[in-house]
Structure formats: C-alpha cells, structure tokens
Amino acid sequence: MSEYLLLLISTVLVNNFVLVKFLGLCPFMGVSSKLESAIGMSMATTFVLTLASILSYLVNQYLLLPFDLGYLRTMSFILVIAVVVQFTEMVVQKTSAALHRALGIYLPLITTNCAVLGVALLNVNEKHDFIQSAIYGFGAAVGFSLVLILFSAMRERLAAADVPEPFKGGAIAMITAGLMSLAFMGFTGLVK
C-alpha cells in the first residue's frame, strides 16, 4: 500500500509531468489565462489521462504483447487516447455546454497532448502492473491539474498587476512557470 502512495506522491509532486518532464506545455500555457477554463481542462484531462492509462495498459497486455505487435504500440495508444477524448468531449458537451464552449479547441487537442501519450508509454517502459498504471495515470493527471490551476490563478493576478511592458504576456508567464518549477524542485528529496 505504501508503494502505491509513494508512486502517487512522486508522480504528483516530485516528477511532475509539466514542470519536470516538460510534457503538456501546450494546454499549460494555452488554457491557463482564466481559472474557470483551467479547472474545466483539469477535470477533462484528469479523466482522459486516468482512463487512457488504464486502457493503454490493457491494450498492451492483452493485444500487443501476446501477438508480438510491440511496433504498433505508439499508434494503438494514440487511437485509444483519441477514443477516450471523443467520449470525454461528448460527455462534457452533454453535461455543460458552457464549459464545452470555454474549453473550445483545447478539448479535442487533449488527443495531441504529449503528456497523455507520455504517461501511456512510460507505464510500459516502467513495467507497471494494472494498479500501478492506474495510479501513475491518476497521479500524472493530479499533478497536471495542480500545476495548471495554480498557474492560472497566478496569471490572473499577474494580469491585474503592474508588470513592466517588456514582461507582459508570455514573458512573465514563462518566468512564473520557471519559478513554479524551482518551487517544485523542493519536493525532490521527498520520495527516494
């Protein structure tokens, strides 16, 4: 049980996919200007990352490995991710049309979010079992959500702050992301 807790903590804080592995930067920078959009994107990405991680494990274990089709791994994982994203988009559209409009193009772009594919491929490389794959996917999603929500809250405050003209917009956003990354480096010794 403690092994699973350590895996979750290390995935969320120590090996954060956005700040340490630099995966998922497109939605991180694109959706983080408003807190409401960031929360919606976080929920959608959490659902997609967790479910895609589980389904990718099952596809790998029960289709690719038994039939020696490892060379189709990346393509099959992208197909799994696309199906999960389409399902998520249909659910979001039915439950909250306002959220669907707020997320706009970023919801279908979860398909091309490298963090989702990265989690699926890293599960295979790390040789995680089913439960570890689910925890790793969920931990990556929680870490992504945590960073995205914190960053969007900071960007909203920065939009109202008196920032020098050369630093407005993307420049101050990148500086803030770098400072967040430094802050998360403080968790490095937390899990061995």
Swiss-Prot record:
It holds the Pfam family Rnf-Nqr. It comes from the Bacteria. The keyword Cytoplasm does not apply. It is found in: Cell inner membrane. The chain crosses the membrane at residues 5-25, 39-59, 65-85, 102-122, 134-154, 171-191. Belongs to the NqrDE/RnfAE family. Part of a membrane-bound complex that couples electron transfer with translocation of ions across the membrane. NCBIfam families: PRK05151.1, rnfA. This is Ion-translocating oxidoreductase complex subunit A. It comes from Shewanella oneidensis (strain ATCC 700550 / JCM 31522 / CIP 106686 / LMG 19005 / NCIMB 14063 / MR-1). The gene is rnfA.
